[in-house]
Amino acid sequence: MARGERRRRAAAAEGARPLERARAAGRRDGRAGGARGSASGAALAVVVLALAFGLSGRWVLAWLRVRRALTLHPAPSALPPDSSSPAVAPELFWGTYRPHVYFGMKTRSPKPLLTGLMWAQQGATPGTPPKLRHTCEQGDGVGPYGWEFHDGRTFGRQHIHDGALRLTTEFVKRPGGQHGGDWSWRVTVEPQASGTPSFPLVSLFFYVVTDGQEVLLPEIGAKGQLKSISGHTSELGDFRLTLLPPTSPGDTVPKHGSYNVFWSSNPGLPQLTDMVKSRLNSWFQHRPPGASPDRYLGLPGSLKWEERGPSGQGQFLIQQVTLKAPFSVEFVFESGSAATGGNQASGRLVGSQLTQALESHAAAFKERFEKTFQLKEKGLSPEEQALGQVALSGLLGGIGYFYGQGLVLPDTSMEGSEQKMDPALFPPVPLFSGVPSRSFFPRGFLWDEGFHQLVVQRWDPHLTREALGHWLGLLNADGWIGREQILGDEARARVPPEFLVQRAAHANPPTLLLPVVHMLEGHDPDDLAFLRKAFPRLHAWFSWLHQSQAGPVPLSYRWRGRDLALPTLLNPKTLPSGLDDYPRASHPSTAERHLDLRCWVALGARVLSQLAEQLGETEAAAELGPLAASLEEPGSLDELHWAPELGVFADFGNHTKAVQLKSRPPQGLVRVVGRPPPRLQYVDALGYVSLFPLLLQLLDPSSPRLGPLLDVLADSRHLWSPFGLRSLSASSLFYKQRNTEHDPPYWRGAVWLNINYLALGALHHYGHVEGPHKVQAAKLYHELRANVVRNVRQQYQATGFLWEQYSDQDGRGMGCRPFQGWTSLVLLIMAEEY
């Protein structure tokens, strides 16, 4: 029986005795007994009322917390009104904002017009349907693929390798009018091997999707060819889409193609691929003049409206063109207002004019790239320069625009009680953001985005202001931002149900402050004007982090949301930290003190304090300045996190290292805790977390703690590898250990580019300021930079991909790919921009 239950039963028994005595006395003295009975009844009524008011008060507080969790923050937006509209930002209205598809464009709108590409090689495997390619997938066998050039606004060129095929997708935008201007695509299909005796038969599928009441009117030419699509929307006005006849690559002479078309109501964006697959059920003949026919599976041969859905559901129109490679096809969007505004006089952006525009944009990209990052001037090889261009282009080409409602589990301020509540929908919000991986994580992640914008802001500061403004627009009334943004049907369809809900008690590293630091140091007037508007939201976000994640003692902090100590977990994960399975205290408790979180809060206090002073926010500066000073005071950090027995900084909590996974049939692998039993102590997990005071440059150059951290960093028995700093010491009991039977190691030894970037920035800093460790830091900086750059380049040359993580044993890429999120930081490492 629980102690609380025993207390309740004892109190109930003791409470009965006085009442019995009063009743006995009342029998002896009726009048006195009546008076005492009235007093007792009044007292009981008071108790009942107090309990009722207490319970109702708790319910009211809980209701208010739920309401605040699901209410947007009242502070003014950091962005102008209608900042995504064609009237305010016409040059950004259209874009490749669908990172999860191999090639597609959409408008920055809650009800967008969407376009996209699918393809299939016909007859590649006799007797089986062709493999239809549309969305980027980890296991579909396509690759390598990615953007060779992408400037984030007006131009891009991508190469896709798919078995025997090599596709090149290109686009150019042309400004004009009031609705975002015109754009043109060119898709080129060639055999992978030159001089092949037989040319593959390939179908390309170009489609248009509306998401509401918009009008599409197709015009069909001879033999089922979709000549054009006329349309109108409230945001685009009148427009026309035209699919030109295929030609040989680099030529303007048309080639013979076979055409099929399909038109229906919009089945829902996640169902587009399946709908097309289900309609590829009829055999047709592709018969060029003077050549033998080839059979292919095609869409229905004539245009007819199918599956008319409810009003407002939208339309889906797709054209299939089939012929033998090599060939090119161009797809053109023309805005009605751009035509009347002068673009018509310039002619359509097709053929030789399109070629000229593509070449001009490619040359301009290369010139601007060198001017911005100066890799050639700094002595980087041509291969490294190309790697830098691909890293930047992949990051910019992965920027998406999302709109929808996320699922949120409100914070009741009582850990564990959230499990008794149902998640609810957050208000509909837009998000303009980079993504970590087009194939595996094609959505916004809070702690990734800060690293993304470190790269983007060097290239296009306006894009960074747009992204930060959108992320800060997700703030709820308490100042919380969900760490993973799953907005819209397409994003939701790619996430397992158990990961859809974002918990309003859980934080994430505040990496959006990293590009804010660069803004502060750069003194760009546009950046400072943005920060002035953004400050109330930045302050609210930081205040929520500082207060909600407070630890058991002053100036300590604890990540809320660690996994429960289940019998199958070697070490309960801490997903909110971003470091997932990095070892923490073996037995989660409220007594934990997390070093990395304290360092993030210290960085936040420093940045917000400096920003408040620069903006003249005196009240906020008076609050934040002392907090920043306290958090950076060496004695406080030492007292809470320096582990003398380990010789490094560390987490603190209820911990034992006597844990392991053992086979226990039929359960499988289960955690076994040996001796000594857990006790409150520093956590002996030397790795990335141990370095955080160094990584975030919180240590004075003369600090006696700096030397030991540099020694650990440089020790191959611990963190140093020929490929970068490993995430966990090679001497750790958790090194490369699975966390469960089905959960391989993640942050337990692999090399991660984001932390290596922070380490290089810190080494660069300490190697350039006076102090006893200046020479050692500078030497380590040059060696680590060379190792990281060399390995990322070699792996890219071998595989054609940037990877999520790299092996500390042989350098090979691991995890998902392409991963042109924070791995694109290799560009800043090559440019020595920290």
Swiss-Prot record:
- Pathway entry: Glycan metabolism; N-glycan degradation
> Can you cite an annotated GO cellular component?
endoplasmic reticulum membrane
| Region Disordered, residue ranges | 1-37
Membrane-related topology note: Single-pass type II membrane protein
Span-the-membrane segments of this chain are 44-64
What residues make up the catalytic site?
A: D580, E804
* UniProt short sequence motif Endoplasmic reticulum targeting, positions renumbered to this chain: 3-9
Which superkingdom does the taxonomy of this entry point to? Answer: Eukaryota
GO terms for molecular function, please? Answer: Glc3Man9GlcNAc2 oligosaccharide glucosidase activity
- For whether the record's keyword set contains Cytoplasm, the answer is no
Asked if 4Fe-4S is a keyword of the record, the answer is: no
Any Pfam family from its record, for instance, is: Glyco_hydro_63
Which sites carry carbohydrate? N654
What is the activity regulation comment for this entry? Inhibited by the deoxynojirimycin derivative N-9'-Methoxynonyl-1-Deoxynojirimycin.
Q: Which residues lie on this side of the membrane: Cytoplasmic?
A: 1-43
Q: Which PANTHER family match?
A: MANNOSYL-OLIGOSACCHARIDE GLUCOSIDASE
Q: What does this protein do?
A: In the context of N-glycan degradation, cleaves the distal alpha 1,2-linked glucose residue from the Glc(3)Man(9)GlcNAc(2) oligosaccharide precursor in a highly specific manner.
What family does this belong to?
A: Belongs to the glycosyl hydrolase 63 family.
Please identify the protein, giving its name as recorded. Mannosyl-oligosaccharide glucosidase
Could you tell me which species this protein originates from? Mus musculus (Mouse)
